[in-house]
């Protein structure tokens, strides 16, 4: 029977993404969001690295003690006693000690023999355990380590007091069948020990390798929101939890909260989400080809592996030269506009003859319908409203601090500091005018905001 949970490493591995830095307040907010999402463990950072990481973990542990955060809190540490002491004094639930165990790492980085490495591993794990904290040992570059030595490393870690060993595919070279075989063999050779998979995505196989590791017996998958991490990152959280739900029938987090957490990390990391990103990208449940849209309108299962509502999303489709009559009719019905079959044929012909337009927005379709029918059409209020809100800040505030506060308001998609009469430009999206008004009021109520000017987006080219 498969048993699996998620360790989220956005605050540790994720912050190792080039150009990404989280403030202390952001670290705390992210930890709360991850706990609300339901991840089993939060790797809160390596406290010996810098004072801000230390302070962030301190505040996160405090929230754990108060019951606000429920996930297990993990502190990262080198196999160095001072690192362990710093993590232990923060009273984290678990210390994760890492050490490179491949011959490449032993020779080039540690300048150590295998025997010396085993001694360091045993001593530091025992030292951490003496502080009354649980220990996970990470076999860094485990995927390129001689198997017999990896068995010895795992056994040494277990005997020294670690209850978990993480096998790190540090340069992302594993492939699924080998991954499953590796974990199955380790569990067979070194029982009474739980295993994690830490899969990097250098070959684009991180999710597949994580699933294979779970099949092989791994019980914790390391992931980061939006797949952040060193180089090209590790297992993307939203992808692995969706795959676990689909393939194993296990809901390891609250799937409908993924979009919020993904957007939060997108804002704080400054790394934009590609529109075609699985699960949380703008195109994840957006259909285009006429045959596809007709199928989805008849039965969404034709072109969707799971309903978008599972992930707090909605389905939609684009209108362009690929569009068929089913999609066009449905779009006009949603707009509340009555179009005859003959008029529909004329509109569709106009759309297909203009091959340069990438997206037909609702306003474009109304213009076409008015052109064909000769009538002035009054549509229903739009289901999605996009707006640009110009913000003027108080003269005595730091604009960047206001920008950060605005970036976490629900409905805010992008925040930019600008020159001119206004200081900040905010892009927002709302399902209706009531929600738009609520977003605007939240922006106006933000500390440091003096005034706003709202412009509705009517057309995108």
UniProtKB/Swiss-Prot annotation:
Record CDD domains: DRE_TIM_IPMS
Catalytic residue positions: 292
Q: Where, in this chain's numbering, is Mg(2+) bound?
A: 13, 198, 200
Q: Which residues bind 2-oxoglutarate?
A: 12, 76, 136, 170
Could you tell me the superkingdom of the organism this chain comes from? Archaea
Keyword Transferase carried by entry: yes
What is the purpose of this protein? Catalyzes the aldol-type condensation of 2-oxoglutarate with acetyl-CoA to yield homocitrate. Carries out the first step of the alpha-aminoadipate (AAA) lysine biosynthesis pathway.
- Protein name according to UniProt: Homocitrate synthase
**Where is the organism placed in the taxonomic lineage, from the top?**
Archaea, Thermoproteota, Thermoprotei, Sulfolobales, Sulfolobaceae
């Amino acid at each position: 029977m498969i048993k699996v949970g998620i360790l989220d490493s956005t605050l540790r591995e994720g912050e190792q993404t080039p150009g990404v830095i989280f403030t202390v307040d952001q670290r705390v907010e992210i930890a709360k969001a991850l706990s609300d999402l339901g991840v089993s463990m939060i790797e809160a950072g390596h406290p010996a690295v810098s004072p801000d990481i230390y302070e962030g973990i301190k505040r996160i542990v405090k929230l754990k003690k108060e019951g606000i955060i429920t996930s297990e809190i993990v502190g990262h540490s080198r196999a160095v006693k001072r690192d362990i002491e710093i993590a232990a004094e923060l009273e984290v639930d678990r210390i994760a000690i890492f050490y490179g165990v491949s011959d490449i790492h032993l020779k080039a980085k540690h300048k150590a023999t295998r025997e010396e490495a085993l001694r360091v591993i045993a001593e530091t794990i025992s030292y951490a355990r003496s502080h009354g904290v649980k220990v996970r040992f990470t076999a860094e570059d485990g995927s390129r380590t001689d198997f017999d030595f990896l068995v010895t490393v795992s056994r040494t870690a277990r005997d020294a007091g670690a209850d978990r060993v993480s096998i790190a595919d540090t340069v992302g070279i594993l492939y699924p069948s080998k991954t499953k075989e590796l974990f199955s063999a380790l569990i067979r050779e070194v029982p009474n020990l739980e295993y994690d998979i830490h899969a990097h995505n250098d070959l684009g196989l991180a999710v597949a390798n994580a699933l294979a590791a779970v099949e092989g017996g791994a019980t914790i998958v390391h992931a980061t929101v939006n797949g952040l991490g060193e180089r090209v990152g590790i297992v993307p959280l939203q992808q692995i939890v969706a795959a676990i739900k689909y393939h194993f029938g296990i809901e390891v987090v609250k799937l409908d909260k993924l979009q919020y957490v993904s957007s939060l990390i997108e804002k704080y990391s400054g790394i934009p989400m590609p529109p075609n990103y699985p699960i949380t990208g703008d195109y994840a449940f957006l259909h285009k080809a006429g045959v596809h849209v007709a199928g989805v309108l008849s039965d969404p299962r034709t072109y969707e592996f799971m309903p978008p509502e599972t992930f707090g999303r909605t389905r939609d489709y684009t209108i362009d030269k690929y569009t068929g009559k089913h999609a066009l009719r449905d779009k006009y019905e949603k707009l509340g506009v009555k179009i005859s079959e003959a008029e529909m044929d004329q509109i569709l012909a106009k759309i297909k003859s203009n091959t340069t337009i990438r997206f037909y927005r609702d306003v474009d379709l109304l213009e076409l319908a008015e052109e064909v029918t000769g009538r002035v059409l009054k549509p229903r209020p739009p289901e999605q409203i996009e707006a640009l809100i110009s913000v003027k800040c108080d003269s005595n505030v730091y604009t960047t601090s206001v920008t950060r506060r605005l970036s976490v308001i629900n409905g805010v998609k992008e925040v930019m500091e600008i020159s001119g009469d206004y200081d900040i430009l905010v892009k927002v999206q709302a399902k209706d005018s009531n929600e738009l008004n609520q977003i605007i009021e939240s922006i106006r109520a933000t500390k440091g905001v003096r005034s706003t000017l709202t412009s509705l987006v009517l057309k995108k080219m």
